[in-house]
Amino acid sequence: MKKNQTMQGTFSKLFGKKHAHPSTTSLYATNPPWIFTHEAQEEGTRDFDGIYYGDNRFNTVSESGTATLKARPRVRPLLTFIPLNAQENHGLAVPTPSVPEDFADKEVGGTSTLVNGNLRLYSSVGDLRPACYDLDSSIPPPPPGPAPGPPQDISQPPGESPPPPPPSVPPPPPPPLLVEPPPPPSTAPPPPPPLDILSPPSTPTPPDFIPPAPPSAFLSPPPPSLPAPGPPAPVSLHTPGTHLFPPGAITKWKSEVALNGRHPEDPRTSPPKSPAELKRSPLGPSPEPHLTFPRSPKVPPPTPVRTSSIPVQEAPGASPEEEEATQKTSAPSPLPPSFNIRPASQIYPDRALEPEQPREPRPETPGSPRLRQSEPQTNGQAGAPPPAPPLPPPAPPLPPPAPSLPPAAPPLPSTELAAPPSSGFMKTSKSNSPALKPKPKPPSVEDTASSEPVDWRDPRQMEKLRSELSAYLCGTRKEDRSLSHRPGPTVALKDKENNKGTSLSEEAAPPSLPEKVHPCIPEKSPSSSSLPEREATSSLVLPPVDYIAQDTPAPSVRQIRSELEARFASSAEKEAKPSLASLPPKPRLEGGRTFENGTDNGRFHKPATKNPPQPSTTPLPTTILQPKVVPGPATSPKVTPGPATPFKPTPGQAILPKATPGLTLPLKPTPEQTTSPKNTPGKATPLKDTPGQATTPKDTPGQDTPPKDTPGQAAVLKNAPELSTPSSQLMAEKDLASVRQREKPETQEDPVATQLSTNGTLSPPALPPKMSTSGEEAPFLYRPHRSQNSHSRGVAVVTPTRARGEAPDSGDVVDEKELQNHPAKSLTPGQPADQLLRHPVTGEVVERGSPMALLLAARQRAQKTRTGGTAIGRSSLPGSLRDHSNQPEASSDSIFYRGSRPNSFIVVPKVPSETEDSHLTSARPTGPSHWKPQQGPDTQGSEPTYRHGWTKAETPAPVARERPAPSSLPQSRALPKSFSSPPSPSYKREEEEEEFSFDIIPPPPEFSNDPEPPAPGQQHQGRRGSPPRNNFSDLGQSWGPNPTPGFSRFRGTQYPESGGLDRFSGSGRSLIKKRLYVGESHRNPGMPRGSTGRSLSSPNCFGPQPGGPEMRRVNSAGRAAPGGLHARRLSLEGARGATEVKFKAPGGGGGSSSKAGDYGFVPAKGSRSPHGNTHYGSPINTFTVRPGTRHPISYAYPGTHRKATS
């Protein structure tokens, strides 16, 4: 029957064969009689029914059950079946519809069903949510709030409503608050209502939520996250936060949260959990028993609810206005999962109430790492709910902040918190994600809390901040947040930049240091600073919390803090100056460092808010969130108003204010400027900073973090795509996170935690963990993501160079430098954040959330992942590379890698970002001069030349990287954003000339990860058909014109590289494999260079691209001696003429071939001569290996090269 149905179904239905008869008759009362008749005939018994009835009705009655089954199969066939009537009858199983209707009714009205349906409906059906949700929530009905609240919270769609919070307010404070709730109300008297609503709601919600989630698990885990949302819930965070989040997050997160394993927070949540659970039971069930109970089971549905419901839910309860705003914003927010953030939103209200509260909780929680953690989560927004949907949530957090913002407007604090929470949320997400992280944070939190409590803990301060924020956020933030949402990211970046600038200018250095320390925990490094920062952060509201999350990573926090403190002590002063003064050349090193400092600062300028180290992260989020939330004004308002106020508390800490101004200013700066401003704000140095910092952070993390970077980046990318707008912001945030992380990289663990928090939050928790793994890398990940793969790569690449080279250069700042590298990296992330994704074809900046953006982000992620591999190689490499970094520092990352590690060297594949980074690295290492030129040349136009010289002088590879970097950087990393900075045709052309290889051949499909590179690559392929020769020229130029400078570096590097190349040749396969994975990553990101270079240079293991930066890198490495190289090229060319030609052909560019040839040639050089051949054979083999890894390489080059080589 079914077979008939299915196969014959269409005909059966058409002809009314038995196929549909029983079902039709039974389920579909209105099957056409003819159909039924036919069906009846065929069906026999059923047929009988059908016939008997003639209509299907009889059958329906008789064969309800059967009919139902049939109905489903039939629905499909019916759907296929054209007749609408029949289809309707058949397809629409009346019974099924009935059931759904019942469900809908029950869902909406019923308890269990409602819960299931309700949540689901709420979630899926916005309809329910508004109608049922708002109303159903009992939000209206249970104005009391307690009853409605919990259920609603639990219900999330319905429960999200603050109503539950209010009811829960009373209870939540005790349970959730644990310590904070009261303060929240107290602290946020004005917001108290919201706070109460939020906070208490948090608690109630957690209870409500908890039951739904896994009441316990969810509450615990999600609640922590959720609590994060609830500032008040800081302590109670879980509970309140959970509640807050639970409404939104819980819905989705119930299961997810449970899964997320907020369990770590569970303990924290535990107490709340009980109350929450109890409450939930009584409250939830009472207000919406169906919702509450179903909630638990209905955890999945809540997910959708989370999106729309959460905002609504909270909106109603907490501040009608705020919650509503949240709801509106939240609900509107595209990312429902993100809208776990709704909880963030909720948190915002909470925050609004508790903007300071969270901070306060922090103070209170100081002793309570968990609380603090909780709080961070609360603030961070366990908003972390994003943990489960980390990415989505992160995005939502941003939006939620916006939503929150509107609502927060009234309770500015909320917004403030909200924005930060958003950030925090992201971070928290991370936190949540890494529930552990939060814990690590605790120490930080404690420290921070202890220190931080000072200022913002003051209810008075809170109130003031709130008022201010209210004023700012009210108008600006609401608007900006919404409007700026998208801009937000940029703004965030800008803010950051500005922060950076401001920070830089202001206490930038010290705060920066604190920030750096902050990674440990602001207060860690400079307790005072930290504290103020924390306070500032507190002021920032979320940022501190966020930062806590980030601080969480402060596992090493204390340790790092000490370190950082020491470092920062000297570095702060030193760095502060370099940051400001060193900008140019020095900043390269120092600038880098400075920028590191600046980055610290700058990085932290980015996080000006971030400045308070925690704020750093938080600011980042804050900034980001703020920007996002308070896009332009928001940023200002958020940072300025919120932070301003908070900063006020922090005023002591210029940083926060700095952040505020910085944020504000940066906000103004264009996103591009963000990159630039980041740099620019940093000062001229910032530029450097951006590149340098990007480089530096990249560098540092690069070593460690690069791999992580990749994951992080992936996460970020994910986030970016998911967040789209948030992406920008997230990116920025991530960048910040990255920056923070970068800062933290010092505390790699910390950074990891932090990054996890920051990035993790932004990234999926998983990523955060990844990040966690490589604290530093995580940031890089972000940055790479943000920046582009380039960044990731750049990070990796730059890290060694910068960290090693630069750090060494800046002897005293070396440590700092590294620290700063992280900050720099941080900046870079900002930069990346700043760096918008650019359409590979159009070159247009892609909207964060757009599909293209997602694709690009994915590509970046992939590249980064590869880069991650590469980065990892690099990471490991970095040690050696770093050591080598000094030597090859100018040379190029790739060289470093090659020199230090042939395998790693691949990592170098400079993505545009990498190029940037390299550029930065190179530029920085090269010296201020280059750096400056880079700045000057930053402009694409000039840069190429500059770069050209640079490349040659400094190192083609880095230049390749850097070139795009400067161009990108100044340009706001537009190019880098493009992933293949080179992708830009103009850019590429310039690059071509400078480093033809890398752009010449579009990456094979495998490389296609770099969307841009392929297009540009292909373009360039044709274009580079001749350019490749240019590449040769380029190389030749490097050899001939700038052999000494470039090659000198290369020589130093090259010689090692020679060894490296040989090594590469020898271990070509390993390298290739690595490169395939990593290199490919590079190829994708650095496709122009890596892909083209590698593809073209594949024969050479795609190590050094003859013409491309990569070639330069590898080639340069290979061509230790310019003359020798040249000669080698010639000989190799002769020997490999066919190969080259072939290569060219396969490469798609004579130049490419040349390059490839060159590349191959490189191996052919002197000692490589044999290698050249061998390399050719081997590289080809390697390529073969590569092909195994990636066919493109193998098919593209192996055959040709091998043949030619052979």
UniProtKB/Swiss-Prot annotation:
Residues 139-151, 159-234, 384-413, 1001-1016 have a biased composition (Pro residues). Keywords: Methylation, Phosphoprotein. Residues 351-363, 454-467, 568-577, 732-747 have a biased composition (Basic and acidic residues). The modification Phosphothreonine is found at T680. The modification Phosphoserine is found at S255. Residues 1028-1041, 1170-1184 have a biased composition (Polar residues). The modification Omega-N-methylarginine is found at R1051, R1083, R1094. Residues 133-547, 568-837, 859-1206 are annotated as: Disordered. Residues 305-319, 414-436, 522-531, 656-671 have a biased composition (Low complexity). This is Uncharacterized protein C6orf132 homolog. It comes from Mus musculus. The lineage of its organism: Eukaryota, Metazoa, Chordata, Craniata, Vertebrata.
